């Protein structure tokens, strides 16, 4: 379990306003019990007045078990919200019965429901045979289908897929996407296989999942993850639709992240990175948080570092660069590069496509130290889990850590960052852009029509007639003195009123989702006096939503 400590928040980086707020309001708030709702209505007061941080008493090693790590974060959120869940139960039960019920449901939520372990043979192009290992974990079926990516990596393990599946459950709940969490992994290094061999592996893995009932539009819907993309998702969709889903009109909804020609959706490739950008945007534009960090709101003149130049890292870098932030370092598994004057994401992307690595990029120098310890405003770990640990957390110089990867921060590192007043924007919120747009793709496949197709021309004509009506009204009033009064929209407004494309709808819906979820997290952080502990606030929100589904549905066969 976690031990909670609370103290007045007097941040070393905070400006005079934040320090003043802490001095004026810490006395009142320190008198409250831990995790109790705050009375302050202004964001700055609750933020500056008090903070909770925690330490995992039973698991202090620098490389903790990944699934235990996620369970520990869950326990932290559950202990904060338990009293509220008991209070909100509208039953005739006694207080003790209500608490037993709440604790029982929390115990149901926490473990992984199903883990499928597979092994199957493939014949390689050279005639040799190889046995491939793979896993699919379904953490929760409180909502169906289950949802989660498929990754190809030699580091895949049962522990990893269980942890990632549980994160998917909480991630979907945080952004109000009605899926349960799942994850799959195939234990291979895709660089060691030809395209033909990868297709064999992908199609056979799909069939093995189908035989066990672990794939289907209403059951379990995979998506791209590490070392997989549109190509692999297309193979999965084709395999399912050509076999077990042959008579299912919704067969192509069995997987998301597909090419457009196979039922994919515009904006899915960049969705996770774009979600990372919107997530950072919502907090970096919040003056109350920035005052505690000693930063000015907005991206302008901010520096950032990206660890991992894959899909998430690239698109995060692109959007932050576009809005005025400067990327000064990029790290990959084979090395890092650095340029204090900034690195252009398009130029680096082109170089990597041509050379297969970021090393040797002519407009940056090799960086020999740890990319995580570069002096910057924003650090984006977008690689793998457990990168920020007790060992390196004291040397991290960033003021904001934006978790583009899943589980990049261990509990001990998380505690250190809270002690140092470093704002960690947690993974279960920040990288939820991918599953959000996957949800839109899934709905598109079930509806069998692209977004905007039914309304595109109607909206354009309606906007045209609205402007024409305004013009005619002005001419009736003033036209006799000066003739016609043309209404000429700006180029930007013209694009907007011409009708929203599918990409426009997806981008707008993603931005709205990330903004709404950020506001919910901020509200919870203030309500429970959590200060900069956004991770606990996000878990509290997720637990409340999942709990509500279980509680109102009832528990079968108990």
Curated annotation (Swiss-Prot):
Expressed in retina, testis and, at a lower level, brain. Substrate binds at residue 84. It is an enzyme of class 1 (oxidoreductase). It is found in: Mitochondrion matrix. One of its GO terms (cellular component) is mitochondrion. Its EC number is 1.4.1.3. One of its GO terms (biological process) is glutamate metabolic process. CDD domains: NAD_bind_1_Glu_DH. It catalyses: L-glutamate + NAD(+) + H2O = 2-oxoglutarate + NH4(+) + NADH + H(+); L-glutamate + NADP(+) + H2O = 2-oxoglutarate + NH4(+) + NADPH + H(+). GO terms for molecular function: ADP binding; glutamate dehydrogenase (NAD+) activity; glutamate dehydrogenase (NADP+) activity; glutamate dehydrogenase [NAD(P)+] activity; GTP binding; L-leucine binding. InterPro entries: Aminoacid_DH-like_N_sf, Glu/Leu/Phe/Val/Trp_DH, Glu/Leu/Phe/Val/Trp_DH_C, Glu/Leu/Phe/Val/Trp_DH_dimer, Glu/Leu/Phe/Val_DH_AS, NAD(P)-bd_dom_sf, NAD_bind_Glu_DH. SMART domains: ELFV_dehydrog. The modification ADP-ribosylcysteine is found at residue 172. Its main location: mitochondrion. It holds the Pfam family ELFV_dehydrog. PANTHER family: GLUTAMATE DEHYDROGENASE (PTHR11606), GLUTAMATE DEHYDROGENASE 2, MITOCHONDRIAL (PTHR11606:SF15). Belongs to the Glu/Leu/Phe/Val dehydrogenases family. Important for recycling the chief excitatory neurotransmitter, glutamate, during neurotransmission. Homohexamer. This is Glutamate dehydrogenase 2, mitochondrial. The gene is GLUD2.
